[in-house]
Amino acid sequence: MTTMFVRHTVSNYSVWRKHYDEFNGIQKAKGVKAQSADNPGDITVTHDFPDLETAQAFAKSDELKTAMRGAGVVGAPTIWFTNKV
């Protein structure tokens, strides 16, 4: 299993959260297995995927980029991946 971490700053947590929750169907369709977020304004989200390739494809998807813009993400996110051992 691969976990993708995404950290970014948002201009307004409430706006970001609404968009994040509305994006749930696309997340699941792209292979997201779990999710969490906390600390308004400085967001770290984790998503679990079956493998690295699926996680990387989701991270590069146009749907994710569009959703982040609409949600008020400020600047480029920091994204990294881990594998369970």
Question: Where are these predicted regions, by residue range?
Answer:
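Short S/T/G/P-rich N-terminal loop/turn motif that feeds into the first structured element of a domain
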Residues: 1-67, 73-85
